[in-house]
Amino acid sequence: MDSLIKLFFCLFIFLCTSLLFGEINGVEGSNQNHHLYPFRPTKLFVFGDSYADTGNIKKAFSSSWKFPYGITFPGKPAGRFSDGRVATDFLAKFVGIKSPIPYFWKDYAGKKRLQYGMNFAYGGTGVFNTQTPLPNMTTQIDIFQNILTTGDIYYPPELTSSVALVSVAGNDYSNFIALNRPASEFPAFIKQVVDQTEVNLRRIHALGVKKIAVPSLQPLGCLPPFTFVTSFQRCNETQNALVNLHNNLLQQVVAKLNNETKQSTFIILDLYNAFLTVFKNKGSNPGSTRFESPLKPCCVGVSREYNCGSVDEKGVKKYIVCDNPKTAFFWDGLHPTEEGWRSVYSVLRESLTASLIKA
């Protein structure tokens, strides 16, 4: 078990590091989806990692600013870890607002653009510090709190109609292995991550945010590096079993918090089962593109030492992109395509309506 965990997360570390730093710009989300229910969110505040980051890392330090990232939307690299829109954009679209501006770009946005909230997520970061030297979630929330304290942009009464997305996609666990900590300590560390997530959720709520959505950990055993050995046909169930402890503890935390508030303030976005549902159905939904090989990534390096977006010293590209990103669930070794995220949020739509809008 010790060697299995180390193999899994060493690969995960390699992928995170190479994709993030060998690899940000707000999106205008659709202003559709007008729900005639009691709670109508008008702002979205985002915290977390590359599944939610829409442009906070400086261009010189992130491959998300390199071609071919962004080829589907907006047609050029724009700081997202995908070919197009990511989780933040689809949640914003669901609640009927424009995608919130990244914190890094706030000084370049007009007041009207800031009214939809702000994105504090940084790719590669975790609940605790990771190998990525960028603000962890505690610091991201500190930044949010400072903005509220100054009162220049947002005022407390405005937060009563706000939603927060809190993305925890596993970077803490890859960092755990990078530090060569013994696998016997791994279960206790998972509890530390979830306990700190609880602290973070409480802080965000105490600052006045009305509803807080936290995704479950996605099935890490279904990431392309770990399905490669089966020609992208099967997920590694042993690795996915390691994810269940995190998700079970997270469910307990959210249930406790909701019991304390006597409301459905905290919501779990079940990414784990949403991903598996898309894989099982191959993305088959009315009006959507079918994923013939949902576990196979669209953009890959030409050999092991290269990744999506890699170029050599002469600027010659060292990656291959599939003919149509809309037919792929995964964009690179870690991140879904825009179409992948669209399919995930299609699966989540019913539960989101019940827990986020109607509740």
Curated annotation (Swiss-Prot):
Its EC number is 3.1.1.-. Glycans are attached at N136, N236, N259. It is found in: Secreted. This is GDSL esterase/lipase At5g03610. The active site is at S50 (nucleophile), D332, H335. Keywords: Glycoprotein, Hydrolase, Lipid degradation, Lipid metabolism, Secreted, Signal. It comes from Arabidopsis thaliana (Mouse-ear cress). Belongs to the 'GDSL' lipolytic enzyme family. GO terms for biological process: lipid catabolic process. It is an enzyme of class 3 (hydrolase). InterPro entries: GDSL, SGNH_hydro_sf, SGNH_plant_lipase-like. Residues 1-22 form the signal peptide. One of its GO terms (molecular function) is hydrolase activity, acting on ester bonds. It holds the Pfam family Lipase_GDSL. GO terms for cellular component: extracellular region. CDD domains: SGNH_plant_lipase_like.
